[in-house]
Amino acid sequence: MKHILHIICLAFCLTAMAAYGTEGKKPSATARQMERAGYVIIQKADPTIHVSLMYARADNFTGRVLYTDLREAYLHPKAAAALVKAQKRLKQLRPDLSLKVYDAARPMHIQQTMWNVVRGTKKDIYVSNPAHGGGMHNYGLAVDITLCNAKGDTLDMGTKIDYLGTAAHINQEDVLVRQHRISKQA
């Protein structure tokens, strides 16, 4: 009888843990730093926005995982409100599409790691130097986004996310279309 009671208790605990998912987990050191700075979690501001942090994976321009303990995307409250507004507008125009966040607020020590990768190369124009205060990502005021379908599959934007080259320059769009380096649809 004791064994059955233990099994029932264990099953209850496992079910409760599965039901709560990661909500019961203690925030990481980086997450606590973001929260102390007053940043908000994008997924809580609007759960319909997809998030796939590119620096939590190795398939980025550095070739390594930079966000070792960060899984949530954070933004300054005003930037988060603007992103939520953009998502609502997108849903009005195209209910089948959604915004997908690849990067948002970024700790300065991560910025330093990125800078170390590009320092002294032709690509250093794409990464803010932390010695000069970093960039808008470091203050929760920049967000790297794309569009995705309901399954989270991204739409073709002409270049891969995190592409460090002229095809990604927004001020060169017309020239790049004429040169067939990007499409008009992108």
Protein language model annotation of sequence segments:
Residues 107:
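Segments that shape or occlude catalytic/ligand-binding pockets
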Residues 1-25:
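Bacterial Sec-dependent N-terminal signal peptides
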Residues 20-104, 114-117, 121-186:
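Extracytoplasmic cell-surface/polysaccharide-interacting catalytic and binding patches
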Residues 110:
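Short, well-ordered surface patches within globular domains
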